[in-house]
Amino acid sequence: MGNYTIAEIVQILIGLFLGIGLLQSGTDKIVDWKGNMSFLTEHFAQTFMRSLVTPMLMVVTVLETVGGILCLGGVAMALLYQNFDLILMGMIVIAFNFVALFAGQRFSKDYAGAAVLVNYFILTIIGILTYYF
């Protein structure tokens, strides 16, 4: 382990935070697919997206799981080799995931749920921006 800049420490911490949260969420969707399908089918029942629940759940599950793995793998790479590329890739995948989740929450008129996602999205964008400033 070498010396890290403040930006690199922030990248590691945000990558760790997002990696844990998103990998857990993606894993939960895989383990409890039936429960998640039931919840989302009801959640989107009164929207034009009701027939898209299965593909939406599949996309979100892949984005969360891949984003989480990239971030956690990236943290390991950063600590072992001072290579931060995987964290950035994970954050980009996770940012797209949050946009998809936000759209779903808004279309289902779950405004409180959409509002909660804003904090995670901002954190993710801050993490991405640390690579460029």
Cite the ranges covered by each PLM segment.
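Cytosolic, membrane-interface loops and tails of multi-pass inner-membrane proteins
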Residues: 33-53
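Extended, low-polarity transmembrane helix blocks
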Residues: 1-28, 58, 62-133
